[in-house]
Amino acid sequence: MYKRQGLYNTGILGAISEFGSYCISITGVIGVLYRPLMLIAYSEGRHDDLVRTVVDGAYIVGLISSLLCGIVMGLSVPILKVWLNDEISHYWLWLVIKMFIIPITTFGSTYSIIYNLWNNVRSSALWSLAIAVIYVGTSVVLLELGVNMTAFLIIGAVAAIMQGAVLHIAIYSHIYPQSMPKVYVRLWRCCAYFALVFGLSFAIDYFINASNLFTLLVEGVLALLVALCVAPIFINAEDLDALDVILPIKTVMRWLNFNWTRQNA
C-alpha cells in the first residue's frame, strides 16, 4: 500500500488505526460479558431467554459503543491535534471512518454467538471468505487506479460492516426469524443514538475548539455528560435490566435511594 499511497499517508493511517484498536478492545470486552449467559440459556434449552439475552445484549453493547465512538468522532479534530499535531488533524475524516464501523460491527458481532452455539459456522466462513476476496480484489483495482486514501477507507468500512454486522445478523435471522423485527428496531435506535452523540459532540467542539489537553478533557467531559443525558430516550426498563447484568446500575440506585431515605427519616 505504501508504494501507492505514500509512506507518510500510510504512517498517519497506522496511527489512526491504533487509536481505533483501543476503542475496539474496550467494546469487545463489554460484548464478551453477555456470552456466558447465552451459553447457559442454550445449554438449558431456554431459547426464549437466549433470544432475549442476545437481542438486549447486542443493543446495550451497541449503545455503549455508540457513546464512546460518537464522542471520539465528534472530537476527532482536537483529538488528533492534541495527540499527534495540528497537521495530522486535517486527516480527521479518516478517524471518523474508522470509528464509524465499530458500533455497527459490535452490535452485529454479538449475534455471532448464536450460530456458533448451533454449530452452524460453515455459512459464516464461506461468506466471510467471499467478502474478503471481493474486498481485496476491489482494493487492488482501486490502488492501481490511484484513488485517494479516503475512498479506500470507505470501501474497507463497507466490507467490515458486511462481514461484521450484516453477515452475522443474516445468519441469525435463519435460526430465530421471529425476533428479527425487534432486532431491526434495536439496530435503528442504536444508529440514531450514535448519530445524535456524534452531532452533539461535534457541536461542542465547534463552540469550544480545543487546542490543548485541558480543553480537550473539558470537551470530552461535556460530551459525555450530554450523551448520558439523552441516553434515557433510548433506554427502557427492559434495557436497564440487561445493562444491570454487567453494570449494577439498579443496585447502586437502590443503595443511594436507601441511604437518602434513611438520612431523611
Predicted regions span which residues?
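Interfacial/gating helices of multi-pass transporter permease domains
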Residues: 3-21, 89-93
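Interfacial segments at transmembrane-helix termini and the short loops linking adjacent helices
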Residues: 7, 55, 72-103, 176
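Transmembrane helix-bundle signature of multi-pass secondary active exporters and lipid flippases
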Residues: 13-32, 64-68, 98-105, 160-163
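Interfacial transmembrane-helix starts/ends
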Residues: 14, 46-75, 92-95, 184, ...
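Helix-loop junctions and terminal segments of transmembrane helices
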Residues: 16, 21-58, 112-117
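Membrane-interface junctions at transmembrane-helix termini in multi-pass inner-membrane proteins
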Residues: 99-131
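Membrane-interface helix-loop junctions in multi-pass transport and translocation proteins
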Residues: 121-125, 129-165, 169, 173, ...
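Membrane-proximal transmembrane or re-entrant/amphipathic helices at the cytosolic face
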Residues: 178, 201-265
